């Protein structure tokens, strides 16, 4: 990845990404976790070739994408964040997290592994090559995680240079933040309404567009290997890690948890 992720409050920034660098950055432990293999087990011989082939495919054909936009926070009003331009961002859990950390700004982020990998996984499935399709689908999911944490790390580094720190990210539909906030967050990154989505086969169905990502009326994103997130910006010195986020996450029965949830922990 090259180039900054953050930028002026009024501007969306999309860094230039190298698919080869992104593919190489996907951690083997995370990839195994998404394949349902114990983290420390290594890749069994039966899956090693397929896993490696998926990584090679993405390094050549993948189109990773990130966009981010920063917004100044005017105040936290109960279960909503009020931005300086008057926009209210709904979400009790997000508002509480930003209030606890005295956040003065919010960064809306969108990441995607790209439409190409979703199309290739679908093509392989349709060609009766389900194993190859599965490996590619899981690798694309690992790419999304990698992009989100990489964006967070770069944003954090830039914030620290300005005497600021990032509050751990939260996504609609996870961690107690309602999925209904998906459209609002999409717009905060820079998404705009588009023409009716004729390919959905539903009269009146529409999509909003943000780079290669589309938001459907249902709140779902296309391609499916995409995610939105919001991060608070504070002048309080805090440290958060992916493992720490998993320890505080209240999502029950998550098969992708990196470490066990702590029995007693103060949520950051």
Model-derived segments and their meaning:
Residues 55-58, 62, 155, 159, ...:
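Structural signal for hydrophobic packing residues in well-ordered secondary-structure cores
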Residues 2-3, 7, 11-133, 268:
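Active-site helix-to-loop segments that bind/position phosphate- or nucleotide-bearing substrates
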Residues 60-67, 148-149, 160-165, 255, ...:
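Intrinsically disordered or highly flexible coil/loop and linker segments, enriched in small
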Residues 103-172:
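Conserved mixed alpha/beta catalytic, RNA-binding, or beta-rich assembly cores of soluble enzyme
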Residues 122, 164, 259-262, 267:
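A generic "cationic amphipathic patch" detector
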Residues 173-265:
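Activity-critical C-terminal alpha-helical subdomain
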Residues 42-46, 50, 136-139, 143, ...:
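Catalytic cores of large soluble enzymes that bind and process phosphate-bearing ligands
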